[in-house]
Amino acid sequence: MTAIASIWAREILDSRGNPTVEVEVTLDSGYIGRAAVPSGASTGTREALELRDGDKQRYNGKGVLKVVEAVNGPISEAVIGIDALRQVQVDNTLIDLDGTDNKSKLGANAILGVSLATARAAAEAVGLPLYQYIGGTNAKVLPVPLMNVINGGAHAPNNLDIQEFMIMPVGAETFRDALRMGAEIFHTLKTILSADGHVTSVGDEGGFAPHLKSHDEAFQYLVKAIEEAGYNPGSEVMLAIDVAASEFYKDKRYFLTEYKTPLNSEEMIEWLKGFTSRYPLISIEDGLAENDWDGWRELTVELGNDIQLVGDDIFVTNPIMLSQGVEEGIGNSILIKVNQIGTLTETLDTIELAKQSAYTTIVSHRSGETEDSFIADLAVGINAGQIKTGSLSRSDRLAKYNQLLRIEEELEDSAIYYGPVFSESNHSCCDHT
């Protein structure tokens, strides 16, 4: 009754108005699972390959009709008849059918859509919420949201090199309260920016994208917004950034707009250390470029005992890359993006390796998103403790937050908000008040 009976893909649009693929998996019992695939703007070079049509006469070459054809043709033929409860078998069939290291034959967007839709259909068939299907009865930790309220870099047309400035409402007792705190700070920040004459248009992920004098000014605005919203920076609300340093790394140098000459790795580390000394900054993602492994090692030596150092582009949700990073002392945390690796099984393998290696895990969206809220269930399913899914505007971001509200409500008294745990384990880093 849980065998896959049919698979159907269609081309839909993501939050940037670009095509992406949506897949429906129907079981012989009639249960249906649907999943839409996200897309990134700043991508790691080792990510599984997202295929596009390349036809400039249609969607400026970004169509995904070839991906749709792959799903409705060879992928469908290979997977129909497999029991949807056998997620590993489904995913391995997809991996073998593609036959490449980076899923470049069929496309990670084709494979991922089928993988996630299968999990959803299976959860429906056995009558479990998706997070519980993924993680069992132990799935009950609601994640701390890393809310991207100021956008820069590849996510916004302004002069900030750092791609994301985020707030983390660790002082809340529940996820519902954390979301409220974030929303209050977000709206306070808007009022402050507007009063100072800044445009309050938003970037890809729903955060503001002002032209500021410096990165320090961005941090200062965040601290001011937290305080004026009635919260304590450092104890109730911590800060996080995604530097996305690979975006401005060239010839082993970092080209920052606020410096006339590029920085080497050591200078870049000192630049980042300055922020940690001046502000309640607890988490730095992609502080150095994905190919600057020597620099990453030094960064980890300098800051790894004090704050969270998150690898995104350097690890790309790949267990092989993470294993190498663990061996070489690179970072202490990994960002989890399902479309970087391409199947749910490989994603879960990477998460398991991270936990065995005492690395923290942050489940993440992409800048090109849809209303699909799979990652909210994934974050609870694996007890990740942290989720990064944008700001407090744009319904493609809020879809994930709203799903987490539903999950917390469903779990009732067994729900555990991770904020106090995170705060306790990092209490010594952020005393700047």
From Swiss-Prot:
Listed SMART domains: Enolase_C, Enolase_N
Cellular-component GO terms for this entry: cell surface; extracellular region; phosphopyruvate hydratase complex
InterPro entries on file: Enolase (IPR000941), Enolase-like_C_sf (IPR036849), Enolase-like_N (IPR029017), Enolase_C (IPR020810), Enolase_CS (IPR020809), Enolase_N (IPR020811)
The reaction(s) this protein catalyses: (2R)-2-phosphoglycerate = phosphoenolpyruvate + H2O
Cofactor field: Mg(2+)
Biological process terms in GO annotation: glycolytic process
Residues binding Mg(2+): 242, 285, 312
UniProt xrefs under Pfam families: Enolase_C (PF00113), Enolase_N (PF03952)
GO molecular-function terms, A-Z: magnesium ion binding; phosphopyruvate hydratase activity
SUPFAM superfamilies in UniProt: Enolase C-terminal domain-like, Enolase N-terminal domain-like
Leader sequence segment: none
EC number assigned by the record: 4.2.1.11
Subcellular location: Cytoplasm; Secreted; Cell surface
Active site (UniProt): 205, 337
CDD domains: enolase (cd03313)
Enzyme class per UniProt: lyase
This protein's UniProt keywords: Cytoplasm, Glycolysis, Lyase, Magnesium, Metal-binding, Secreted
Annotated PANTHER family: ENOLASE
Record function comment: Catalyzes the reversible conversion of 2-phosphoglycerate (2-PG) into phosphoenolpyruvate (PEP). It is essential for the degradation of carbohydrates via glycolysis.
Protein name in UniProt: Enolase
Species, as recorded: Lawsonia intracellularis (strain PHE/MN1-00)
Gene responsible for this protein: eno
